[in-house]
Amino acid sequence: MESALRFFALTGLLMASTTTARDVPQNVRDLYNSIRSQGSCKNQLKGGFYSQEGDSKNFGYCGDHLADYKIMYLQGKNGELVNMDIDCDGALGEGDGSCDSSGDTQPQTTFQETVAGYNKGIKDLNAYIHSFVVLGNDGSKNGYIEFKPEQYGIEPLSTVAVVCGDKMFYGVWGDTNGDDGPPLIGEVSDSLGRACYGSAVNGNAAHDENDVLYIAFAGSDAVPGANGAKWNAKSFSEFESSLGSLGDKLVQRIAGGGGGGGSPGDPPASDCSWEGHCLGDKCSKDGDCDGELVCKAKKCAVDA
Protein backbone atom coordinates (compact mmCIF):
# COMPACT_ATOMS: atom_id res chain seq x y z
CA MET A 1 0.00 0.00 0.00
CA GLU A 2 2.84 2.37 0.91
CA SER A 3 4.58 1.77 -2.42
CA ALA A 4 1.31 2.42 -4.25
CA LEU A 5 0.91 5.74 -2.46
CA ARG A 6 4.47 6.67 -3.39
CA PHE A 7 3.72 5.80 -7.02
CA PHE A 8 0.65 8.04 -7.16
CA ALA A 9 2.49 10.87 -5.42
CA LEU A 10 5.35 10.56 -7.91
CA THR A 11 2.88 10.46 -10.80
CA GLY A 12 1.33 13.73 -9.61
CA LEU A 13 4.72 15.39 -9.33
CA LEU A 14 5.75 14.21 -12.79
CA MET A 15 2.50 15.49 -14.28
CA ALA A 16 3.02 18.91 -12.73
CA SER A 17 6.65 19.03 -13.89
CA THR A 18 5.84 18.15 -17.52
CA THR A 19 3.58 21.19 -17.81
CA THR A 20 5.65 24.22 -18.71
CA ALA A 21 4.65 27.13 -16.50
CA ARG A 22 5.22 30.73 -17.44
CA ASP A 23 7.33 32.99 -15.26
CA VAL A 24 5.29 35.75 -13.67
CA PRO A 25 6.31 39.00 -15.47
CA GLN A 26 7.55 41.73 -13.16
CA ASN A 27 4.64 44.04 -13.94
CA VAL A 28 2.16 41.28 -13.07
CA ARG A 29 4.12 40.46 -9.93
CA ASP A 30 4.01 44.14 -8.95
CA LEU A 31 0.25 44.21 -9.58
CA TYR A 32 -0.20 41.07 -7.47
CA ASN A 33 1.73 42.58 -4.57
CA SER A 34 0.00 45.96 -4.80
CA ILE A 35 -3.47 44.37 -4.77
CA ARG A 36 -2.64 42.34 -1.68
CA SER A 37 -0.95 45.23 0.12
CA GLN A 38 -3.90 47.54 -0.60
CA GLY A 39 -6.05 45.10 1.34
CA SER A 40 -9.40 45.45 -0.42
CA CYS A 41 -10.95 46.70 -3.64
CA LYS A 42 -11.79 50.41 -3.90
CA ASN A 43 -14.04 50.04 -6.95
CA GLN A 44 -15.92 46.80 -6.36
CA LEU A 45 -18.10 45.96 -9.34
CA LYS A 46 -20.03 43.37 -7.33
CA GLY A 47 -19.45 41.85 -3.90
CA GLY A 48 -21.06 39.42 -1.50
CA PHE A 49 -19.58 36.23 -2.97
CA TYR A 50 -17.96 33.26 -1.29
CA SER A 51 -14.48 32.04 -2.16
CA GLN A 52 -15.49 28.68 -0.71
CA GLU A 53 -18.70 27.53 0.91
CA GLY A 54 -19.16 28.74 4.46
CA ASP A 55 -16.51 31.47 4.44
CA SER A 56 -16.87 35.22 5.01
CA LYS A 57 -18.73 36.14 1.80
CA ASN A 58 -16.33 39.09 1.52
CA PHE A 59 -15.18 38.39 -2.03
CA GLY A 60 -16.03 40.08 -5.29
CA TYR A 61 -15.16 41.38 -8.74
CA CYS A 62 -12.80 44.36 -8.66
CA GLY A 63 -12.61 47.20 -11.19
CA ASP A 64 -9.80 49.27 -9.69
CA HIS A 65 -7.87 48.99 -12.97
CA LEU A 66 -10.75 48.68 -15.40
CA ALA A 67 -10.29 52.20 -16.75
CA ASP A 68 -6.49 52.32 -17.04
CA TYR A 69 -5.39 48.73 -17.74
CA LYS A 70 -8.77 47.43 -18.94
CA ILE A 71 -8.63 44.50 -16.54
CA MET A 72 -10.96 43.02 -13.95
CA TYR A 73 -9.84 40.70 -11.17
CA LEU A 74 -11.18 38.84 -8.14
CA GLN A 75 -10.39 40.02 -4.63
CA GLY A 76 -11.36 39.59 -1.00
CA LYS A 77 -10.57 41.74 2.01
CA ASN A 78 -7.61 42.05 4.39
CA GLY A 79 -5.14 41.28 1.61
CA GLU A 80 -6.87 38.15 0.40
CA LEU A 81 -7.45 37.23 -3.23
CA VAL A 82 -9.54 34.08 -3.87
CA ASN A 83 -9.07 30.32 -3.89
CA MET A 84 -9.10 27.83 -6.76
CA ASP A 85 -12.01 25.42 -7.10
CA ILE A 86 -12.06 22.81 -9.88
CA ASP A 87 -14.57 22.74 -12.75
CA CYS A 88 -15.18 19.48 -14.61
CA ASP A 89 -18.02 20.69 -16.84
CA GLY A 90 -18.13 20.22 -20.59
CA ALA A 91 -17.07 17.48 -22.99
CA LEU A 92 -14.70 15.49 -20.78
CA GLY A 93 -14.14 12.44 -22.94
CA GLU A 94 -11.20 10.35 -21.78
CA GLY A 95 -8.86 11.80 -19.19
CA ASP A 96 -6.75 10.83 -16.21
CA GLY A 97 -9.78 10.30 -13.97
CA SER A 98 -9.17 13.36 -11.82
CA CYS A 99 -12.73 14.53 -12.49
CA ASP A 100 -14.30 11.22 -11.47
CA SER A 101 -14.70 12.42 -7.88
CA SER A 102 -16.66 15.52 -8.87
CA GLY A 103 -20.26 15.53 -7.70
CA ASP A 104 -21.18 18.69 -9.57
CA THR A 105 -20.38 18.04 -13.22
CA GLN A 106 -22.55 19.64 -15.90
CA PRO A 107 -22.72 18.18 -19.43
CA GLN A 108 -21.84 21.46 -21.13
CA THR A 109 -20.13 24.78 -20.49
CA THR A 110 -21.82 28.16 -20.80
CA PHE A 111 -20.42 29.03 -24.23
CA GLN A 112 -20.73 25.57 -25.79
CA GLU A 113 -22.58 26.85 -28.85
CA THR A 114 -19.84 29.37 -29.62
CA VAL A 115 -17.12 26.76 -29.23
CA ALA A 116 -18.96 24.34 -31.53
CA GLY A 117 -19.53 27.19 -33.98
CA TYR A 118 -15.79 27.62 -34.40
CA ASN A 119 -15.93 24.40 -36.46
CA LYS A 120 -12.65 23.07 -35.13
CA GLY A 121 -13.80 19.51 -34.60
CA ILE A 122 -14.88 19.86 -30.98
CA LYS A 123 -18.36 20.30 -29.54
CA ASP A 124 -17.39 21.92 -26.25
CA LEU A 125 -14.50 22.75 -23.97
CA ASN A 126 -12.82 19.78 -22.31
CA ALA A 127 -11.75 20.34 -18.69
CA TYR A 128 -8.96 17.79 -19.15
CA ILE A 129 -7.46 19.80 -22.03
CA HIS A 130 -8.63 23.40 -22.17
CA SER A 131 -7.39 25.96 -19.67
CA PHE A 132 -10.54 27.85 -18.81
CA VAL A 133 -11.71 30.06 -15.96
CA VAL A 134 -15.17 30.36 -14.46
CA LEU A 135 -16.38 33.97 -14.24
CA GLY A 136 -19.81 35.49 -13.73
CA ASN A 137 -22.76 34.28 -11.68
CA ASP A 138 -26.14 33.43 -13.21
CA GLY A 139 -29.22 32.30 -11.37
CA SER A 140 -32.83 32.98 -10.51
CA LYS A 141 -33.08 31.58 -7.00
CA ASN A 142 -34.21 34.01 -4.34
CA GLY A 143 -31.22 35.77 -2.79
CA TYR A 144 -28.68 34.49 -5.30
CA ILE A 145 -26.19 37.21 -6.28
CA GLU A 146 -25.71 37.63 -10.01
CA PHE A 147 -22.86 39.24 -11.93
CA LYS A 148 -22.38 39.56 -15.67
CA PRO A 149 -18.78 40.34 -16.72
CA GLU A 150 -20.05 41.37 -20.18
CA GLN A 151 -21.40 44.58 -18.63
CA TYR A 152 -17.80 45.61 -18.00
CA GLY A 153 -16.38 44.66 -21.37
CA ILE A 154 -15.27 41.11 -20.56
CA GLU A 155 -16.30 38.99 -23.55
CA PRO A 156 -17.07 35.25 -23.65
CA LEU A 157 -14.06 33.05 -24.41
CA SER A 158 -11.71 36.00 -23.87
CA THR A 159 -8.23 35.58 -22.47
CA VAL A 160 -7.63 35.36 -18.72
CA ALA A 161 -4.26 35.27 -16.94
CA VAL A 162 -4.01 33.17 -13.78
CA VAL A 163 -1.23 33.64 -11.23
CA CYS A 164 -0.96 30.59 -8.99
CA GLY A 165 1.87 29.19 -6.90
CA ASP A 166 4.38 31.76 -8.22
CA LYS A 167 3.72 30.85 -11.84
CA MET A 168 1.35 32.06 -14.53
CA PHE A 169 -0.87 30.42 -17.12
CA TYR A 170 -3.25 31.69 -19.77
CA GLY A 171 -6.80 30.47 -20.18
CA VAL A 172 -10.13 31.67 -21.52
CA TRP A 173 -13.35 32.65 -19.81
CA GLY A 174 -15.17 29.40 -20.50
CA ASP A 175 -17.93 28.89 -17.94
CA THR A 176 -20.11 30.65 -15.36
CA ASN A 177 -21.23 29.85 -11.82
CA GLY A 178 -24.84 28.72 -11.48
CA ASP A 179 -27.32 28.87 -8.63
CA ASP A 180 -27.14 25.15 -7.82
CA GLY A 181 -25.12 26.26 -4.81
CA PRO A 182 -24.11 29.47 -3.02
CA PRO A 183 -22.70 32.39 -5.08
CA LEU A 184 -19.06 31.41 -5.47
CA ILE A 185 -16.05 32.83 -7.32
CA GLY A 186 -12.60 31.42 -8.04
CA GLU A 187 -12.76 28.30 -10.22
CA VAL A 188 -10.84 26.83 -13.16
CA SER A 189 -10.88 23.76 -15.38
CA ASP A 190 -9.35 20.60 -13.97
CA SER A 191 -6.36 20.78 -16.32
CA LEU A 192 -5.51 24.34 -15.30
CA GLY A 193 -5.89 23.55 -11.62
CA ARG A 194 -3.56 20.57 -11.90
CA ALA A 195 -1.03 22.63 -13.87
CA CYS A 196 -1.01 25.01 -10.91
CA TYR A 197 -1.07 22.58 -7.99
CA GLY A 198 -0.53 19.07 -9.36
CA SER A 199 -2.37 16.13 -7.82
CA ALA A 200 -3.27 18.18 -4.73
CA VAL A 201 -6.42 19.26 -6.59
CA ASN A 202 -9.08 17.29 -8.46
CA GLY A 203 -12.82 17.31 -9.07
CA ASN A 204 -13.46 17.10 -5.35
CA ALA A 205 -10.40 18.87 -3.89
CA ALA A 206 -9.68 22.58 -4.20
CA HIS A 207 -6.75 24.85 -3.42
CA ASP A 208 -8.27 26.61 -0.42
CA GLU A 209 -5.80 29.43 0.21
CA ASN A 210 -7.00 32.81 -1.05
CA ASP A 211 -3.79 33.63 -2.90
CA VAL A 212 -4.73 33.14 -6.57
CA LEU A 213 -4.97 36.13 -8.92
CA TYR A 214 -7.35 35.91 -11.88
CA ILE A 215 -6.93 38.74 -14.42
CA ALA A 216 -9.67 39.11 -17.05
CA PHE A 217 -9.01 41.45 -19.99
CA ALA A 218 -11.77 43.70 -21.32
CA GLY A 219 -12.35 44.36 -25.01
CA SER A 220 -12.80 42.38 -28.21
CA ASP A 221 -9.02 42.28 -28.73
CA ALA A 222 -8.83 39.85 -25.79
CA VAL A 223 -10.86 37.21 -27.66
CA PRO A 224 -8.70 34.74 -29.64
CA GLY A 225 -11.69 33.69 -31.76
CA ALA A 226 -11.85 30.62 -33.96
CA ASN A 227 -8.34 30.93 -35.35
CA GLY A 228 -6.47 32.51 -32.45
CA ALA A 229 -6.21 29.40 -30.27
CA LYS A 230 -5.66 25.67 -30.78
CA TRP A 231 -9.23 24.66 -29.87
CA ASN A 232 -8.69 21.10 -31.14
CA ALA A 233 -5.56 20.64 -29.04
CA LYS A 234 -4.86 17.17 -27.65
CA SER A 235 -3.25 18.34 -24.40
CA PHE A 236 -3.34 21.14 -21.87
CA SER A 237 0.13 22.33 -22.86
CA GLU A 238 -0.80 22.50 -26.53
CA PHE A 239 -3.88 24.62 -25.86
CA GLU A 240 -2.36 26.87 -23.20
CA SER A 241 0.73 27.59 -25.30
CA SER A 242 -1.50 28.61 -28.23
CA LEU A 243 -2.74 31.53 -26.10
CA GLY A 244 0.79 32.76 -25.42
CA SER A 245 1.14 35.39 -28.12
CA LEU A 246 -2.18 37.08 -27.36
CA GLY A 247 -1.77 36.69 -23.61
CA ASP A 248 1.68 38.28 -23.62
CA LYS A 249 0.33 41.22 -25.61
CA LEU A 250 -2.57 41.75 -23.21
CA VAL A 251 -0.34 41.57 -20.14
CA GLN A 252 1.57 44.56 -21.50
CA ARG A 253 -1.48 46.69 -20.67
CA ILE A 254 -0.51 46.46 -17.02
CA ALA A 255 1.82 49.21 -15.78
CA GLY A 256 5.46 48.29 -16.30
CA GLY A 257 4.68 45.90 -19.15
CA GLY A 258 6.24 48.11 -21.81
CA GLY A 259 5.40 47.60 -25.48
CA GLY A 260 3.08 49.65 -27.62
CA GLY A 261 5.52 52.57 -27.73
CA GLY A 262 4.76 53.75 -24.19
CA SER A 263 7.29 54.18 -21.44
CA PRO A 264 7.53 51.25 -19.02
CA GLY A 265 5.44 52.04 -15.97
CA ASP A 266 2.97 54.21 -17.83
CA PRO A 267 -0.57 52.80 -17.92
CA PRO A 268 -1.97 52.17 -21.38
CA ALA A 269 -4.17 54.81 -22.87
CA SER A 270 -7.89 54.35 -22.17
CA ASP A 271 -10.62 54.72 -24.77
CA CYS A 272 -12.49 56.87 -22.26
CA SER A 273 -12.24 60.63 -22.74
CA TRP A 274 -14.10 61.68 -19.57
CA GLU A 275 -11.94 60.86 -16.56
CA GLY A 276 -13.94 59.62 -13.59
CA HIS A 277 -16.84 58.58 -15.83
CA CYS A 278 -15.25 55.55 -17.50
CA LEU A 279 -16.00 51.84 -17.46
CA GLY A 280 -16.47 50.72 -13.86
CA ASP A 281 -16.64 54.23 -12.37
CA LYS A 282 -19.51 55.17 -10.09
CA CYS A 283 -22.66 56.79 -11.54
CA SER A 284 -26.27 57.60 -10.71
CA LYS A 285 -27.71 57.90 -14.23
CA ASP A 286 -26.75 57.17 -17.85
CA GLY A 287 -25.63 60.74 -18.46
CA ASP A 288 -22.92 60.30 -15.86
CA CYS A 289 -20.99 57.91 -18.11
CA ASP A 290 -18.68 58.56 -21.04
CA GLY A 291 -19.70 57.89 -24.62
CA GLU A 292 -21.98 54.90 -25.15
CA LEU A 293 -21.56 53.59 -21.61
CA VAL A 294 -24.69 53.32 -19.47
CA CYS A 295 -25.27 53.38 -15.73
CA LYS A 296 -26.01 49.91 -14.31
CA ALA A 297 -26.07 49.12 -10.60
CA LYS A 298 -24.46 52.54 -9.99
CA LYS A 299 -21.43 51.66 -12.18
CA CYS A 300 -20.66 52.79 -15.75
CA ALA A 301 -21.02 49.68 -17.90
CA VAL A 302 -21.33 48.46 -21.47
CA ASP A 303 -24.91 48.44 -22.74
CA ALA A 304 -25.14 44.67 -23.25
Protein language model features and the residues they cover:
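Intrinsically disordered, low-complexity linker and terminal regions at domain boundaries
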Residues: 202-211
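Intrinsically disordered, low-complexity regions enriched in glycine and serine
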Residues: 257-264
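Short, solvent-exposed secondary-structure boundary/capping segments
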Residues: 179-192
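Short beta-strand-to-coil "C-cap" segments at the C-terminal boundary of structured domains/repeats
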Residues: 215-221, 299-304
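Secreted, cysteine-rich disulfide-bonded mini-domains of extracellular proteins
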Residues: 264-304
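Cell wall/extracellular polymer interaction/catalysis modules
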Residues: 22-167, 171, 177-180, 197-200, ...
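Fungal secretory targeting signals
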Residues: 1-22
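Aromatic sugar-binding interfaces of carbohydrate-active proteins
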Residues: 190-196, 209
